[in-house]
Amino acid sequence: MQEVTSSFTPRVIEASVQKFWTQEDIYARVQEQNRDGKTWFFVDGPPYTTGHIHLGTAWNKILKDSILRYKRMHGLHVIDRAGYDMHGLPIEVRVEHELGFENKKDIEAFGIGAFIERCKQFALSHKDIMSEQFKSLGVWMNFDDPYQTIMPEYIEAAWWTLKQADEKGLLDRGHRVVNWCPRCETAIADSEVEYWDEQDPSIFVKFPIHGLMNEYLVIWTTTPWTLPANVAVAVDKDFIYARVEAIKEGKKEILWIAKDLVEPVLKRGKYQDYSILSEKTGEELAGTTYDSPLADLIPRQKEIVHTVVTAGFVEMDNTGMVHIAPGHGWDDYLLGVEKGLDVFCPVDGAGYYTDEGGIYAGQFVRDANEKILSDLGSHLLGRQKITHRYGHCWRCKTPIIYRATEQWFISVPKMKEKMLSEIKATSWYPDWAGSARFYDFVSDARDWCISRQRYWGIPIPVWQCSSCSAHRVFGTVAELNAAAGSNLTDPHRPYVDEITVPCSCGGTMKRVEDIFDVWFDSAMASWATLGFPRNDALFHEMWPADFITEGQDQTRGWFYSQLGASTIAFNRSPYKSVLMHGFALDADGRKMSKSLGNVVTPEEVVQKFGVDVLRLYILSSNAPWEDLKFNWDGVSTVNRTMNILWNVYRFPLPYMILDGFSPAQTSDGKYDDEYIVRSYREMPEIDRWIISRINTIARSVSADMDEYQLHRVTRLLMNFILEDLSRWYVQIVRPRMWLEEDSPDKKFAYETITYCLRTLCRLLAPFTPHITEAMYENLRLPEDPVSVHMLKWPAGDIRLIDENLERRMDVVRKFDEAVANARQAGKRKLRWPVQNVIVVTSSESVIEAFRSMEDLAKDRANTRNIEVIQGSWERMRFNAEPVMKKIGPSFGKKGPVVKGLIEAADGSALRKQLEESGSVTLSDGSEEFVLTAEHMTFSQHLPEGIFGAEMTDASVYVDTTLTEDLEAEGYSREIIRRLQEMRKQLDLNVEDNIVIDAVIEDVHLRELLSASWLDLIKQEVRGKTLKIHDSVGGRDGSVLFQLDRDWDIEGVNVTLGISLAG
């Protein structure tokens, strides 16, 4: 045991602790210690290896690490292999940026093989960077052997799963509309589309009804570029549509518009007048044919029979008619399938019109908007700009388009019911994350597009015959090699693309060019990390995962993809319990971004406050499933708590070292936990209380941790440090450590604070692993386990919990607070004693507390006497005040008379009579008035010098009247405080004695300080001598003090000089 620095230096402590962990291989030793324990299988949701971690990533890993440390302290054999998502657009786009590429053509020119190698190196190097960053946050996981989605054995897990889908009839290839990034030239998932506001054209277009002159259907759209692919107009079958004769500049037109929208549409078109000629329902309008206004410019449009159809998604806004292009919209596509419409998509993968786009061929679709608007000519009824939310590619930020393409799909609807039942069978934290949010999302899930038209990813293991179109799915590389007679080792592109397989028809099978959606990659994590399917031993032993946790966006991402893939492969959920956490936002609740200038990095926080403060702040700020609104003031508050913890830990060390204290130990030299149990009944009440408190806290913390309520856990522990330990126990026990002689009381104090600190280290270890390791290292005995993280979790010893004691102490603490409030009202500092404190109560529990803890209550209140009065206090007077809003309705014109009677009456007597009988009768001599409590209120009228405050079930009154004796003690306490501050300024050791010299010119103060008070001052500050002078001139001029200071003590100037005693 050694003394420690007076200030908390987190970065020094954390660097030292992490060095210790590395040199002593503590993580591996903890894992080995638990090797025979029950297995607890955790799967790490893999982050993309794209760069430095951000605050949200840090929160994610800190949350995981805290839970894993907690589980290890329960003796569980925790499977904690880190994971990394190393394929996909996140990596490709970064590499493209490094190489200066703009599109796929640049990649093809560079060479797919060379590009793949650059992606691989990028992913590997950033994996290493991120691992080191996670380690610097104190995160313990298996970073030496993480699962990586680029490894052949991992890739095989995806291949095997797809083969299961194919064999179970869940794999399908079809021509469907998908989200499409024209820059990346690939399909992207719904969850990968990011939305923000953009300006687009908002246009009203007239579609001429076939065979009729000047008669039109009016539609509205924000995507003019999709008009070349129009095949139908949708209406609601129940809406009423009006056939309107509209007049503009003397010309008449017949327009069909939803009846309720006629006026705003015509206003938009600047028509001067109109009349409704007839009406039809949407159902009656269905079947009407019309011509495309662009038919002369797009030959294919002349071949299409354009028809009005009914649809359930049409809303009563704009015109009430929806332009339908099944090749460019999901709802449009589904409607097209239902109604047998053409799925016309004249747009290529880069977003340019193909030859089928007629006059627009070769133009980028969004660039063609203005040309299309111009070509519409008189068919453009009106136009304006609209700001609306529009989707963008999650990686390159390009506005997406919707495009019908050939893709591979998993038929989710076929297994949806099983997925929903598995959601119900899973434990969710919070419950609504699964039972509502995730359940609702899966209920609406459609076929999962698993194919991507890119390069760096897991190649889809489907080989298709060019002759007969038969396909074959390979589940392993070995299976492929056997069929192809090849020796493939790296199943990435372009190597796998070179493998051909003979078809039974005599033709040749070649691999389809697509790669997997990266969400399909990570969906395999729970079995791929166990080596399945190459090795199934660990899988059968451990799967499914006991626990996973990720952000709330993963209900659409990893939670979903895992459940889908696992239902395909094993017909059950891959996880037993799931904790969903929130997003890391700025203080105003905005997403952090460089453009807003509101990004806070984990490194910034660590540089200022250290890792443990960051961890404790993140965990305590809010419930895990709520968004974290990062606030520097909150971090500072947590930092103050950590400093207080350090000071509490530091406080007893000098005394223990001076006294040669060593805590109780067992015969084999280890700390003896049972000593406290054996000695508990002999200990002072305050020691028993803090021991009971920390065990009560331990039980609460354990229950909350089992429900993943980490915010409640960390707040409980911080409150214990601040309120129970620092502001209560340490303040009360401090004088016992100053005792010169050895005594049972001092030993109990040492044993108690050692027990509390060691227990607190264990309770805090999962959340603040560095400071607790440093504290434990200094407190542990030589034969104890070398690390706090090798200790057993303290679940709370019921043998050491005294609920009655805690209740009684709670009364005294509330009394202490009430006294402080009353003193503040009376402007009497706590260091100044008072003669009497009165407690007025009717509560038996309050009376019992003061009966058993009177000495402690007196000491805390700094009072010579406490008087507990049951019922009412005779010196308390009350003034009665009439309540006119009640008196008026009750007594009418007599209200002023009643008011006067109440004001003239004895308020205390009125209050007493109301308490006893519920009513009181007052008379003006001619008439009596019966009043109840609603007719008056009462205000206290305290005697002079007495100030009051309320506490639970009691009122507290402090008599601040000063006597000379009280004044003498008050000044003595003030001088003691100044001398202690001066000792601290000289950095004296606890055992150092000093000589004191005081100049007090005030005659009254000198007369107050009798010998007994001077002895008290010397005793409290280890003063060997204390000389008092009436002026500076009275001092011995030859004596120089190490520290000499002038102090203003309650308006009296006092000069104090101290030196180390010889």
Curated annotation (Swiss-Prot):
Please provide, in alphabetical order, the Gene Ontology terms of the cellular component aspect for this entry: cytoplasm
Write the record's keywords in alphabetical order, separated by commas. Aminoacyl-tRNA synthetase, ATP-binding, Cytoplasm, Ligase, Metal-binding, Nucleotide-binding, Protein biosynthesis, Zinc
Identify the Pfam families for this entry.
Anticodon_1, DUF5915, tRNA-synt_1
Motif 'KMSKS' region mapped to chain = 591-595
MF-aspect GO terms: aminoacyl-tRNA deacylase activity; ATP binding; isoleucine-tRNA ligase activity; tRNA binding; zinc ion binding
Alphabetical GO biological process terms:
isoleucyl-tRNA aminoacylation
Location in the cell: Cytoplasm
Q: Where on this chain is 'HIGH' region (motif)? A: 47-57
Superkingdom as given in the UniProt entry: Archaea
* Enzyme Commission number(s): 6.1.1.5
Q: Which cofactor does it need?
A: Zn(2+)
**Keyword Acetylation on this protein?**
no
Catalysed conversion reaction: tRNA(Ile) + L-isoleucine + ATP = L-isoleucyl-tRNA(Ile) + AMP + diphosphate
* PROSITE patterns for this protein: AA_TRNA_LIGASE_I (PS00178)
Q: Binding of ATP: at which residues?
A: K594
Q: Which NCBIfam families match?
A: ileS (TIGR00392)
Q: What is known of its domains?
A: IleRS has two distinct active sites: one for aminoacylation and one for editing. The misactivated valine is translocated from the active site to the editing site, which sterically excludes the correctly activated isoleucine. The single editing site contains two valyl binding pockets, one specific for each substrate (Val-AMP or Val-tRNA(Ile)).
Family statement: Belongs to the class-I aminoacyl-tRNA synthetase family. IleS type 2 subfamily.
- HAMAP family xrefs: Ile_tRNA_synth_type2
Subunit text: Monomer.
Summary of the function given for this chain in its UniProt record: Catalyzes the attachment of isoleucine to tRNA(Ile). As IleRS can inadvertently accommodate and process structurally similar amino acids such as valine, to avoid such errors it has two additional distinct tRNA(Ile)-dependent editing activities. One activity is designated as 'pretransfer' editing and involves the hydrolysis of activated Val-AMP. The other activity is designated 'posttransfer' editing and involves deacylation of mischarged Val-tRNA(Ile).
Q: What is this protein called?
A: Isoleucine--tRNA ligase
Organism, scientific name: Methanospirillum hungatei JF-1 (strain ATCC 27890 / DSM 864 / NBRC 100397 / JF-1)
